[in-house]
């Protein structure tokens, strides 16, 4: 039976928004997909031409899904406006299913004058290979038109609140753990779409001169392997990179370090009781607090071994030294990155477009110097 929904609505109720757009990664009973859209003419001023809401049931026939309803409406309308270029933005409670993702990819290939940005509150069946592949096809960057997909953060939720929620008399108040859930989903989408780092970002952040100023971000690249018949087998579905979350009054008021964001992510993988090896490549070694939390993790998860390769040592005085020693004592392997680790990260995590890794002046000397300092820190058990 056809779902009893009007084609579009202009506003949703406050409780409807909070219930359906909650970004907790795993939620049950959210069977209605809400798609808020904006269509703008492409140009300097980019006025909004239309902004409404489609909705549909996830378990209904594909033609009743909101993505398909939007395409049906937009295709008919485009017949009268073939020459104009448009930028379309979606804010959806769930990412598209495989059928809708494939249909949207086909539409974009047929109409290159339309660009599409999709902000999603949650990822639908993100652990299933066919869903992962459909989203990769939809968002592939080379060879054909593609969509840009991002996870909704505070700004997008606030925008939807202001634009698509009726009767609002108060500002948007984020629910508990919104920023933490955003971080998890952002990293998961990066794994799924196989996001790569900009070459300049890698070079500037992983430059291993022992003393640098102005580097307040930490980047953490990671890979996971499982032991099988005595051989470590890469799990490429759990490979990616993330960075620390800057202080934000609407997100993490005190910020959140990259290592803690990474520890938030690991339980999301649902690793079983087999033996795993997790390897991190970080632009800075962990601070005292992060080292303590990582030590707790490996103590509580004896089937997971942890290897950390750092480009630089973060504040190698006082408590940071103590934190590194604790982490090392509890079983983590800690070392400084050398040429082979930098090259591996360049080849694996950077959008290098075929360019080989070019070491900067002093890379080997800096690595040797830092390795000596790290050995002294880890061996100085008396401090």
Swiss-Prot record:
Residues 1-60 are annotated as: Essential for cytoplasmic localization. Its cofactor is Zn(2+). Residues 209-335 are annotated as: Necessary for homooligomerization. The record marks 244 as: Interaction with DNA. Keywords: Antiviral defense, Cytoplasm, Hydrolase, Immunity, Innate immunity, Metal-binding, Nucleus, Phosphoprotein, Repeat, Zinc. GO terms for cellular component: cytoplasm; nucleus; P-body; ribonucleoprotein complex. The keyword Phosphoprotein applies. InterPro entries: APOBEC/CMP_deaminase_Zn-bd, APOBEC_Cyt_Deaminase, CMP_dCMP_dom, Cytidine_deaminase-like. Residues 29-138, 214-327 form the CMP/dCMP-type deaminase domain. DNA deaminase (cytidine deaminase) which acts as an inhibitor of retrovirus replication and retrotransposon mobility. After the penetration of retroviral nucleocapsids into target cells of infection and the initiation of reverse transcription, it can induce the conversion of cytosine to uracil in the minus-sense single-strand viral DNA, leading to G-to-A hypermutations in the subsequent plus-strand viral DNA. This is DNA dC->dU-editing enzyme APOBEC-3G. It comes from Papio anubis.
